[in-house]
């Protein structure tokens, strides 16, 4: 069982534990997110997120095909697709559809606590998954990471505080995401994210997540070691912002 959790996090994990595996034959090659990030030289490495809503208040109803095409055409190096249904309005269909459209890495963004979810990510065309340290025991984190890697998928190991980071740095996780949003209170603390980013060794790929609103935010996060930027709410509200952020 995952860690002891409260509130909406406990609910979303309970739902995740019961989600069914989707059995389909993968038709898409695997696009390595790490490779796309490392090969980004003359622009900012942006992973554009598609989500219809969020517990923090977002509520947008955009066309997925139009959105992901636009992001790819305007320089995004990856697409993040929320597949959690209750709190983010996502679906496995969104992931499957996005995978048919773009030829850049796709992250299945969800509260992953079972191997079934990872199988589904692979089968529907995801190239990477998110593993959130906060909701997993150490043993679960390692097992799920290794399971994903054995399928050829990459995993972003997400941390929100120093405790999470301490666990993440004990293992050879090559991509670490630093979420500026506290998953319990939903408050964004960019200062804390900068502090965490600075503590991560440079041999890891560092992705800054949440609270990024403009080019200045990206410039600032780069000073603290961020290699890539996962941006959702800002781009869902105004997709044209990608041109400014790149």
UniProtKB/Swiss-Prot annotation:
InterPro entries reported for this sequence: Aldolase_TIM (IPR013785), Indole-3-glycerol_P_synth (IPR045186), Indole-3-glycerol_P_synth_dom (IPR013798), Indole-3-GlycerolPSynthase_CS (IPR001468), RibuloseP-bd_barrel (IPR011060)
Principal EC category: lyase
Catalytic activity: 1-(2-carboxyphenylamino)-1-deoxy-D-ribulose 5-phosphate + H(+) = (1S,2R)-1-C-(indol-3-yl)glycerol 3-phosphate + CO2 + H2O
A GO MF label: phosphoribosylanthranilate isomerase activity
Record-annotated membrane-spanning stretches: none
EC number, as in UniProt: 4.1.1.48
Pathway as given in its UniProt record: Amino-acid biosynthesis; L-tryptophan biosynthesis; L-tryptophan from chorismate: step 4/5
PROSITE patterns on file: IGPS
Any one Gene Ontology BP term: L-tryptophan biosynthetic process
Entry keyword set: Amino-acid biosynthesis, Aromatic amino acid biosynthesis, Decarboxylase, Lyase, Tryptophan biosynthesis
NCBIfam families, A to Z: PRK00278.2-1 (NF001374)
Family, per entry: Belongs to the TrpC family.
PANTHER family for the chain: INDOLE-3-GLYCEROL-PHOSPHATE SYNTHASE, TRYPTOPHAN BIOSYNTHESIS PROTEIN
Protein name: Indole-3-glycerol phosphate synthase
């Amino acid at each position: 069982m995952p860690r002891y959790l409260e509130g909406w996090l406990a609910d979303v994990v309970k739902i995740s534990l019961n989600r069914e595996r989707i059995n389909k034959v993968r038709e898409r090659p695997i696009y390595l997110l790490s490779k796309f990030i490392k090969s980004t030289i003359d622009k900012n490495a942006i992973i554009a997120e598609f989500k219809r809503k969020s517990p923090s208040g977002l509520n947008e109803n955009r066309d997925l095909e139009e959105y992901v095409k636009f992001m790819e055409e305007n320089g995004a190096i990856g697409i993040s697709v929320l597949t959690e249904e209750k709190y983010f309005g996502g679906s496995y269909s969104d992931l499957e559809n996005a995978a048919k459209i773009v030829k850049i890495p796709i992250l299945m963004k969800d509260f992953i606590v079972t191997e079934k979810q990872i199988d589904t990510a692979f089968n529907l065309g995801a190239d990477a998954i998110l593993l959130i340290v906060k909701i997993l025991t150490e043993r679960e984190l390692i097992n799920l990471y290794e399971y994903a890697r054995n399928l050829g998928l990459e995993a972003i190991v997400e941390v929100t505080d120093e405790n999470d980071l301490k666990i993440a740095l004990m293992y050879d996780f090559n991509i670490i995401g630093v979420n500026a949003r506290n998953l319990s209170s939903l408050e964004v603390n960019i200062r804390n994210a900068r502090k965490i980013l600075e503590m991560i060794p440079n041999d890891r790929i560092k992705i800054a997540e949440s609270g990024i609103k403009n080019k200045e935010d990206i410039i600032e996060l780069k000073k603290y070691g961020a290699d890539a930027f996962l941006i959702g709410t800002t781009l869902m509200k105004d997709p044209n912002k990608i041109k400014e952020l790149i």
